[in-house]
């Protein structure tokens, strides 16, 4: 009896899956950095526009304060602490030149905070200014006045200025001991002051400037002179990772 082979219905044909060995690939050291790069081009452009806008606003602040050089001390210090001083190099240089020109005229004026801040900014930028301006804060016995201890912002400013001493400046050597002793005592009672001192030390150490800038952002928003635009600029500048991605994408 002949056997007839009948083709199986199409619905009855079962395709067996083709099994392949799974390769055990190690994760890329680059992660997904390049996967998102195209989307970041627009973001980078938008961020650049915002940075330029914020820089323009801050330039207006320099212009408004130009009539009184002492009013520029605080903005310059804030800009440097926030790590965005390179955006305003010409404005800062011009302002410090004016401040230096009147340095002798205000030799005996100002409170501890402003005298120390003026001294620190000028000396840090290479001006040869005398530390004799701090003699006015000593008593008849040659010691720093005890009344200064309650001026914490002034003491912190003085502490930072003392780090810019040169060999043989006994006034500043004594100032460093004086401020360190009293600030350590006060910081034990104030977490904010402790944070400010830590930020100051980090900023004095060149290798930790960016870390100091990040820490100061949280301090700055509570300052009386707080500028929302300046803080935005600092945050954008700190978080600007798009440029780093672009540099990586250029690697052959």
Swiss-Prot record:
Belongs to the terpene synthase family. Tpsa subfamily. This is Putative pinene synthase. Pfam families: Terpene_synth. PANTHER family: (-)-GERMACRENE D SYNTHASE-LIKE ISOFORM X2, OS04G0344100 PROTEIN-RELATED. Keywords: Lyase. When compared with the genomic sequence of the wild strawberry, an insertion of two tandem cytosine nucleotides in the middle of the coding region caused a frameshift that was followed directly by a stop codon, leading to the potential production of a shorter, probably non-functional protein. GO terms for biological process: terpenoid biosynthetic process. It comes from the Eukaryota. InterPro entries: Terpene_synth_N, Terpene_synth_N_sf, Terpene_synthase-like, Terpenoid_cyclase/PrenylTrfase. GO terms for molecular function: terpene synthase activity.
């Amino acid at each position: 009896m002949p056997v007839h082979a009948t083709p199986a219905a199409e619905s009855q044909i079962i395709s067996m899956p083709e099994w392949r060995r799974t390769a055990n690939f190690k994760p890329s050291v680059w992660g997904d950095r390049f996967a998102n790069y195209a989307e970041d081009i627009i973001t980078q452009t938008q961020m650049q526009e915002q940075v330029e806008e914020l820089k323009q606003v801050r330039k207006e602040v320099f212009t408004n304060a130009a009539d009184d050089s002492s009013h520029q001390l605080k903005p310059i210090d804030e800009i440097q602490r926030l790590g965005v001083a390179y955006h305003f190099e010409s404005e800062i240089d011009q302002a410090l030149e004016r401040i230096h020109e009147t340095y002798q005229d205000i030799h005996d004026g100002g409170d501890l905070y402003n005298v120390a801040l003026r001294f620190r900014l000028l000396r840090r930028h290479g001006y040869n200014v005398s530390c004799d301006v701090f003699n006015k804060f000593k008593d008849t016995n040659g010691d720093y006045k005890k009344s200064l201890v309650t001026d914490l912002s002034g003491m912190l400013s003085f502490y930072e200025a003392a780090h810019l001493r040169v060999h043989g400046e006994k006034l500043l050597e004594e100032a460093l001991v004086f401020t360190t002793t009293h600030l350590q005592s006060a910081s034990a009672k104030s977490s904010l002051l402790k944070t400010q001192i830590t930020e100051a030390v980090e900023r004095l150490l060149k290798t930790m400037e960016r870390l100091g800038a990040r820490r100061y952002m949280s301090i700055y928003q509570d300052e009386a002179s707080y500028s929302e635009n300046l803080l935005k600029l600092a945050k954008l500048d700190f978080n600007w990772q798009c440029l780093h991605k672009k540099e990586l994408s250029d690697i052959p």
